[in-house]
Amino acid sequence: MTQQIDRYAVFGNPIEHSKSPFIHTLFARQTNQPLIYTAETAPKEGFVEAVKAFFAEGGKGCNVTLPFKEEAYQFASRLTERAQLAGAVNTLKKLDDGDIIGDNTDGAGLVQDLLQHQVVLAGARILVIGAGGAARGVLKPLLDQKPTSLTITNRTFSKAEELAVLFAAYGSVTAKEMNTVTEEYDVIINSTSASLSGELPALSSSIFAANSTSYDMMYGKGDTTFNQWAKQHGAAHAYDGLGMLVGQAAESFMLWRGLRPGSKQILRELRKNLEGL
């Protein structure tokens, strides 16, 4: 009798350009884990039905991307602490008792990538640009690294204020209006998607301290719009979100398989794939 190969997937809409199957196939090869990982388009109004069917047909776990992370949060029968704080789920796993646990590995992926680049977060002055789901998902893991301060700025100030209140118990968190952000920061994280449309947040270029690091969660061929601007105005280091993508995937893989794959080689392969080399 042939053994059933464990099935995993990523659900989103659109999903055609997802790098997750590429990443997880390499993880599986690296760790000698027999599994299949596919990209699945869920209808905009049919995410829950699609995921239920996937698990009913024997699926073991899945990643969830836009626009379904909040729905996945509602769907999960149990949540990790970091998923509860993120208010969104990017990883689902079916447990032996049939329950579906929801996790959010985005923040862990970001922190892992920053630390791999030797970015010092302990004692740092961190600025997070944006106050949407991407920002909310990474605040707790960033605060766990014990920065001196974490400032959130956003076009709609009230959203930044809401996040500052929500995470106040976990460290020194403040919200600032964009036009009042003039002091220097050690680590500047752009959680907005502005770079995808070639736009920049309305911020002063005085935010980059000596030896500062710019991190844009978006990625593409070459530097993002935000990182180009950061380097022009004094950022000593600039990284895009491709390493975060690999890091959050490694964290998901760990949740599913109990093994942590190595990220460095996979990131190199993914970068080559992205550049069309």
Swiss-Prot record:
The keyword NADP applies. Its EC number is 1.1.1.25. NADP(+) binds at residues 81, 130-134, 154-159, 217, 241. GO terms for molecular function: NADP binding; shikimate 3-dehydrogenase (NADP+) activity. The active site is at 69 (proton acceptor). Pathway: Metabolic intermediate biosynthesis; chorismate biosynthesis; chorismate from D-erythrose 4-phosphate and phosphoenolpyruvate: step 4/7. It catalyses: shikimate + NADP(+) = 3-dehydroshikimate + NADPH + H(+). One of its GO terms (cellular component) is cytosol. It is an enzyme of class 1 (oxidoreductase). The keyword Amino-acid biosynthesis applies. Gene3D superfamilies: Leucine Dehydrogenase, chain A, domain 1, NAD(P)-binding Rossmann-like Domain. Shikimate binds at residues 18-20, 65, 90, 106, 219. Keywords: Amino-acid biosynthesis, Aromatic amino acid biosynthesis, NADP, Oxidoreductase. Coiled coil: none annotated. InterPro entries: Aminoacid_DH-like_N_sf (IPR046346), NAD(P)-bd_dom_sf (IPR036291), SDH_C (IPR041121), Shikimate_DH (IPR011342), Shikimate_DH-bd_N (IPR013708), Shikimate_DH_fam (IPR022893), Shikm_DH/Glu-tRNA_Rdtase (IPR006151). GO terms for biological process: amino acid biosynthetic process; aromatic amino acid family biosynthetic process; chorismate biosynthetic process; shikimate metabolic process. Belongs to the shikimate dehydrogenase family. Homodimer. Involved in the biosynthesis of the chorismate, which leads to the biosynthesis of aromatic amino acids. Catalyzes the reversible NADPH linked reduction of 3-dehydroshikimate (DHSA) to yield shikimate (SA). PANTHER family: BIFUNCTIONAL 3-DEHYDROQUINATE DEHYDRATASE_SHIKIMATE DEHYDROGENASE, CHLOROPLASTIC (PTHR21089:SF1), SHIKIMATE DEHYDROGENASE (PTHR21089). This is Shikimate dehydrogenase (NADP(+)). It comes from Vibrio vulnificus (strain YJ016). The gene is aroE.
